[in-house]
Amino acid sequence: MIWIALVLWSTLLTSVVSQPEERLGNAVCEAISNAISPASDVFYFGGKLFFADIHHWAISSTQYPACTVEPGTAEDVGIILGILSSTQTPFAVKGGGHASNPGFSSTTGVHIAMTRFSEVAYDSTSETAIIGSGLVWDDVYASLAPHGVNVVGGRVTGVGVAGFILGGGMRFSWLTNQYGLTIDTVVAYELVKPTGEVANVTENSDPDLFFALKGGLNNFGIVTRFTLRTFPQGQVWGGLITYTQNHLSEVNAATVKFSNDVTDPKAAIITTYNFLLGQPGVSQLLFYDGPTSPDGIFDDFLAIPHFTQDVKTRDFMSLVLASPSNATQNLRGVFNTVSLLGYSDTLIDAIFWGAKLSIDTGLFISYDVEPFRPNIFSVSDTHTESAYPPSRSAGLLPLNLYYAWSFDISDDVFHDAIRQSAAHLYNVAVGQGQSDIVGAAVYPNYAIFDTPVESMYGSNVARLKQIKASVDPDNVMALAGGFKI
């Protein structure tokens, strides 16, 4: 019922986004249109594809550009970058459009939509899949399912492939406990460098650039395709349970017990504490990579009286769709995060303090508690050094904070509130003895827009700057938004 209300409200808000401001002239857009091949197109304000190109999951991430460009080949991406560089035109690159930070994948300049990079090609001999950067994970899972294989990707519907991987591949997968971070399963990146050169970047061909692309976001060019390792995938068990606020203490206890006691790498959960118009509740996702779950792993959750329950044996795609995460699209929103080493009852109880900051005016607020095994940074047999995480000595667990609201007049209020909430939870964790999180890296894909790059990449920043200067001597990628090296 709460999700229906959100859908109706968010649909209403699609007409509230600001109208186009004074935009760039069409000269750059026309130059691009004249230079690219027939495989690519340029679109202007008013057209259906223009609006599809700029659409984001959070409307606060949408801006109105002078035009949108849908490149159809890597070579055309290079041509586009050349024109943008020579004219010093601000631009954005959008993959799936799930970024919440304003200006990270949107612009008032030239908006590059990677929509046409939509292939999924499975190679049974190498046990890899080539995946286009314009896809969302839903598309990938659906394409690989007939082959009985899967990749380590996003857990809920609507998440883009490109941002997920380039931001660290750690908005953890249901398969992370078994196979590691998504970035540790990347075999190759097809990258259009800022100079326009198209390169197939592997650990052997260019180890420094390969390192930088593993979590370094859009600082080194535009990735058009990823080659990922695949893994066998059969039926899974799990789904969504919702609980009302009178069972919060039981959910807290079950979550902490799971986090501390469960060692089966096939088992995973997300406990999401929701506040809809100030009313608390819990959305509980359960997952087991097999048709049935062993006794004892999820018993505590199943024993709690529920409001709704959809837990069963199903295919992997069905489980991904079980989470109603798209119900909050078309709202204004922001993520933030705290890196933790574990969860306790008192730490989870502290979540409610943060919610009270905006409980009277926030349309939707959520905190995702995501327990994983402590060896997640080293479980992959192919893991190598990466831009993120800068250290793999401890398996950090990123608590994901998400605030959603209706109108831009409240942006600063909610940005400040989510910062305060994250700071409070961090202080509680440190006070409980999690001293190793002091100075620990923040996960880029959850980080709020003004997070310093040093907080994400730590001691790797100096090396990343050297790589950036080498691959992008004219600093072309500084014309695009995002966390800048």
Model-derived regions: residue spans:
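Soluble FAD-dependent oxygen oxidases
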Residues: 2-3, 9-485
